[in-house]
């Protein structure tokens, strides 16, 4: 009987483990995001008879795509960014670039937030040509407006031709771009959470709206930025 009991325990334990693993596998979910490029992902898609030729600067077109994705139960729409004017093919290649005319991502996802209810909106912003405080403020503002539906696609800008648009004659080298990206990402997250939840007291009787003595901690200075909330 003791042997039978042990065998039953082993069988039962293995069975429970199998069922648990199977249930865990079956209950996993996949997140789906719609990658919206203005005129499609094929370079010549805009030439199709049924295409929207001015899709890059046609907000109604983007709104309909986002709303369709939302009805299809997608989790998010994703907006890439291109700021270089001429690629390696020179002016002849530029003539055929459909992304030469497109919305700035943060502006676009802010507008898409207003015409959707549940779907996430993800915008691309490079850390190479921006500053952490400004970036933190932009995304937190959008996150507050749309109820936590915004996302940030962090890139470091690989195209050397983009630097001139920001008044930088020489593109920052690869290692420095990634070090800067890590520093900015850390600072942005710190800025988002730098004040305690109770810091905004809003006491009508005393007239005190904000209590600055309740910080969670000032962000540290880095290699590229001397950040301070004091």
Question: What is each stretch, according to the model?
Answer:
Residues 74-81, 121-122, 152-155:
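Short beta-strand segments at enzyme active-site cores
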Residues 99-103, 128-133:
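Acidic-and-aromatic substrate-binding clefts and catalytic sites of carbohydrate-active enzymes
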Residues 23-116:
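N-terminal beta1-alpha1-beta2 module of alpha/beta enzyme domains
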Residues 14, 18, 23-25:
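Low-complexity, intrinsically disordered or signal/transmembrane-proximal segments
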Residues 28, 131-230:
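Internal, glycine-rich beta/alpha segment that forms the wall or movable "lid"
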Residues 37, 82, 126-128, 155-157:
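Active-site beta-loop-alpha junctions enriched in small/polar residues
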């Amino acid at each position: 009987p003791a042997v039978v009991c042990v065998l039953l325990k082993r069988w039962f334990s293995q069975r429970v483990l199998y069922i648990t693993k199977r249930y865990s596998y079956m209950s996993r979910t996949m997140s789906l995001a719609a990658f919206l490029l203005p005129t499609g992902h094929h370079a010549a898609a805009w030439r199709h008879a049924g295409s929207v030729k001015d899709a890059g600067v046609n907000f109604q077109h983007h709104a309909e795509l986002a709303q369709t994705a939302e009805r299809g139960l997608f989790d998010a729409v994703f907006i890439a960014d291109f700021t270089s004017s001429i690629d390696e093919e020179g002016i002849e290649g530029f003539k055929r670039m459909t992304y030469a005319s497109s919305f700035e991502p943060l502006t676009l996802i802010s507008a898409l937030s207003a015409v959707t209810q549940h779907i996430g909106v993800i915008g691309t912003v490079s850390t190479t040509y921006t500053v952490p405080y400004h970036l933190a403020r932009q995304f937190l503002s959008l996150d507050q407006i749309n109820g936590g539906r915004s996302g940030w696609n962090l890139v470091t800008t690989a195209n050397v031709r983009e630097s001139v648009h920001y008044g930088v004659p020489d593109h920052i080298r690869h290692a420095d771009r990634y070090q800067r990206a890590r520093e900015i990402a850390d600072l942005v997250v710190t800025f988002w959470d730098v004040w305690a939840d109770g810091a905004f007291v809003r006491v009508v009787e005393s007239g005190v709206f904000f209590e600055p003595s309740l910080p969670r901690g000032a962000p540290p200075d880095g290699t590229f930025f001397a950040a301070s909330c004091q």
